[in-house]
Amino acid sequence: MNSVPASAYLTLAIILFCIGLFGALTKRNTVIVLVCMELMLNAANLNLVAFSKLGFFPNLTGQIFSLFTMSVAAAEAAVGLAILIALYRNRTTVNIDEMDKLKG
């Protein structure tokens, strides 16, 4: 049975990371920026799993670290969305350009 080569995983991870980076740098909506940052983090997780499974010395360390990173990312997304909801209630917008002032 043939396995998918490591270059396919790495290419997919690079494409996902570049899409996330482009979205995070060009979009003005805070929710979209958070989603793009999660996409970049998932690309890094894909690299961890690919190197763990197809690396020179395959072991489970990269996969376990990827699961840990996913749980931290879920907590980060929850906190980020909670802060975003609080800012929306205060400013009535989620546009990044409008959130440059610290005082109300």
From Swiss-Prot:
Spans through the membrane: 4-24, 31-51, 67-87
One Pfam family per UniProt: Oxidored_q2
Protein name: NADH-quinone oxidoreductase subunit K
Signal peptide annotation: none
Subunit structure: NDH-1 is composed of 14 different subunits. Subunits NuoA, H, J, K, L, M, N constitute the membrane sector of the complex.
Gene3D superfamilies (alphabetical): 1.10.287.3510
Major site of localization recorded for this protein: membrane
Catalytic activity, EC: 7.1.1.-
Family: Belongs to the complex I subunit 4L family.
Function description: NDH-1 shuttles electrons from NADH, via FMN and iron-sulfur (Fe-S) centers, to quinones in the respiratory chain. The immediate electron acceptor for the enzyme in this species is believed to be a menaquinone. Couples the redox reaction to proton translocation (for every two electrons transferred, four hydrogen ions are translocated across the cytoplasmic membrane), and thus conserves the redox energy in a proton gradient.
Keywords tagged on the record: Cell membrane, Membrane, NAD, Quinone, Translocase, Transmembrane, Transmembrane helix, Transport
Any single biological process term in GO: ATP synthesis coupled electron transport
Membrane topology annotation: Multi-pass membrane protein
Localization per record: Cell membrane
Cellular compartments per GO CC: NADH dehydrogenase complex; plasma membrane
Catalytic activity: a quinone + NADH + 5 H(+)(in) = a quinol + NAD(+) + 4 H(+)(out)
